[in-house]
């Protein structure tokens, strides 16, 4: 599965998803794009899941009909030490996530 790590997340998080093709927004040349434009560009680049900590995206963007889904990591901060405990649940969730869906990992 092709995963895109949002630019507000520590890029080392990608190393915790070894079973997937995981890239950061910066590496994929998608840094600086805002929510709607980022989703459009990520879909066009073939990404299936955007991993983010931005819990507002589902309220700001309609995901109906999109091929990309959102995996929102709900942690106290976007630091790796706070996100790392959520990774096992995130990896499990990737097995059941479908296009246009939003999953929150707490």
Model regions and ranges:
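Acidic, metal-binding active-site segment of PIN/NYN-like and related structure-specific nucleases
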Residues: 42-63
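C-terminal structural segments of small proteins and small subunits
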Residues: 68-106
């Amino acid at each position: 599965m092709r995963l895109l790590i949002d630019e507000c997340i520590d890029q080392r998080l990608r190393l915790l998803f070894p079973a997937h093709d995981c890239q950061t927004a910066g590496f994929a040349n998608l840094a600086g794009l805002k929510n709607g434009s980022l989703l459009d560009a990520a879909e066009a680049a073939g990404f299936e899941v955007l991993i983010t900590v931005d819990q507002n995206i589902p309220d700001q963007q309609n995901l109906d009909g999109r091929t990309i889904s959102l995996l929102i990591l709900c942690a106290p901060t976007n630091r790796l030490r706070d996100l790392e405990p959520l990774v096992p649940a995130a990896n499990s969730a990737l097995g059941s996530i479908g296009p246009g869906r939003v999953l929150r990992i707490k």
